[in-house]
Amino acid sequence: MQIIVRDNNVDQALRALKKKLQREGVYREMKLRRHYEKPSEKRARERAAAVRRSRKLERKRAERDGIR
């Protein structure tokens, strides 16, 4: 990953770096890897995330179609 510092503006370069790291999911990965996660816990977490995604998709579809 490369960030260009223009006109010695380090603050702007740091903001750009943080934004890139956020988009790449580095912070989320660091948070998950702080402690060991058992495979069963990982499966449960991923399953719960899939359920949340599917519910959100259903809500969006219902809202788009005008169904409550």
From Swiss-Prot:
InterPro entries: Ribosomal_bS21, Ribosomal_bS21_CS, Ribosomal_bS21_sf. Coiled coil: none annotated. GO terms for biological process: translation. The keyword Ribosomal protein applies. GO terms for molecular function: structural constituent of ribosome. Disulfide bonds: none annotated. This is Small ribosomal subunit protein bS21. It comes from Zymomonas mobilis subsp. mobilis (strain ATCC 31821 / ZM4 / CP4).
